[in-house]
Regions:
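A generic structural signal for short coil/turn motifs at secondary-structure boundaries
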Residues: 44-45, 77
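Generic alpha-helical secondary structure signal
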Residues: 24, 77, 121-124
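Juxtamembrane/interface motifs at transmembrane-helix termini
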Residues: 43, 86-88, 108-109
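A hydrophobic, small-residue-rich beta->alpha segment in the mid-to-C-terminal subdomain
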Residues: 53-99
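Short loop/turn motifs at secondary-structure junctions and domain boundaries
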Residues: 47-51
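Cysteine/selenocysteine-centered motifs that mediate thiol-based redox chemistry or coordinate metal-sulfur cofactors
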Residues: 93-127
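Phosphate/ribose-recognition catalytic cores of enzymes acting on nucleotide-derived substrates
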Residues: 1-42, 55
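Intrinsically disordered, low-complexity N-terminal regions enriched in serine/proline/glycine
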Residues: 2, 13-14, 32-33, 64, ...
Length: 127
């Protein structure tokens, strides 16, 4: 596994029933999101784990977005022989994620990243 970190405060959502995770990144000029198409997470004695399937969505403060790494995904799906069912799941989940961005629901709801960040500061940092 690899480690990834941001320089800015961030809030991360992992899902048991969705094939993506969402990182809300708090910057001076707005909230950015980096979304990974990935397996649902599992937790074991070592860490929280998931498989990253290369496809990503970067969402800007105005909620415009860009799908990233399509070429890398296409290369890996051939090289690693992703089964048809897996490819279908990943495309469906990518569409669900786009819908969440476009409809501004879940982590993309107005103010949600800051609400969760403030909640973290109150409940964890003030102990």
């Amino acid at each position: 596994g690899r480690f990834w970190h941001t320089r800015e405060p961030s809030v991360v959502w992992f899902f048991k029933n969705h094939w993506f995770n969402i990182i809300g990144i708090i910057r001076d000029h707005g909230i950015f999101y980096y979304c990974n198409i990935a397996s649902p997470y599992v937790i074991d004695d070592e860490a929280l784990k998931y498989i990253d399937y290369d496809l990503d969505i970067k969402v800007f403060p105005d909620y415009s977005y860009k799908v990233l790494d399509r070429n890398e995904y296409n290369l890996h799906k051939k090289k690693m022989e992703y089964p048809e069912k897996l490819r279908e799941i990943l495309e469906v989940e990518l569409d669900k994620l786009r819908g969440m961005v476009e409809n501004r629901v879940g982590p993309f709801a107005e103010g949600e990243v800051m609400r969760q960040y403030e909640r973290f500061k109150e409940n964890v940092l003030n102990q």
